[in-house]
């Protein structure tokens, strides 16, 4: 098989190709004349067309892809187009013996960072999901390593599969998280990757983002549905494995998203709270505060008289920590105060929060004003953030309800206001927003 068949030798592009071939000093170290005498590459002159032609004809197996690769290296789009017209196979990988790996021309173009060349190769049929590369990286993996968002979007729009793992078990978005590339993560999330594919350690994208302490990326992943209680190979949940290694604010985010503070790792014989205490002694920090408050709150909402077996197993250990028990008592005291203080409609502050946990937003909306007046935030320092969270939910719900009810009251005059209000309460926030 000839790289350049005889029928195209006389095309006007031949001299351009030959000149380029010599000019770039391709990977050939020696060339041979008729007598098989080696001549150094530097002795070849631009007019030695016959010599170069013989070289190409005598080594046709991989010269086409080599010339194409060199054209990509020098970003010669004119040469690339000519080679593609001649039928050079864009999916033929060039093997590098010293690296024991292959490298497609699409990988190479992505590595160089030339979007136009990448686009040309994709149009010519280059495999966008080619994994014949170092560590079985796809072109998308490389684009993310280069932090090239334009090429990443081009590959995604061309059908790049975000769920292909490399030899380390990393899908492309794992690479973006490792590089703390928030912009790239944002782009990748728009194409709906599977966030639960784990790497070789069994860690999901969220798991690694939490350990990397990147608050913004953690928030993005949570907003896009990443599971908060996935487990790694060792059987640790995200909360358990990161509680003593990440930012305290991230711990709070995980807890607010429903991370289980009671998860017991049998091998460790710890739940997140006791594991944190074990690692940090009796230090009292925001992390301990959030863990205890969430644990106590959940235990009361679920009508649990005592803590879960995870705490019981470590009871002797936890009871020996004075500051831990002191803070635990503060949490429980605030719970008792919440059960006493009324927020209106015969509901206590605790009932209000419990309603929020159950997504009963109508209850929140009905007593929101009295709650705002009646709650003394100085008395609820520990659970202040939780109360504020549901106040925002209640305010938004009430705003939507009032707007729609007032609108309907002006047109429906034969029904009492309260009846209209009850009817409107049956609607979801999305349905309310659609009514103008």
Curated annotation (Swiss-Prot):
ANK repeats lie at residues 63-92, 101-130, 135-164, 168-197, 201-230, 234-266. It comes from the Viruses. Keywords: ANK repeat, Repeat. InterPro entries: Ankyrin_rpt, Ankyrin_rpt-contain_sf, F-box_dom, PRANC_domain. SUPFAM superfamilies: Ankyrin repeat. The keyword Repeat applies. Residues 409-436 form the F-box domain. This is Putative ankyrin repeat protein FPV026.
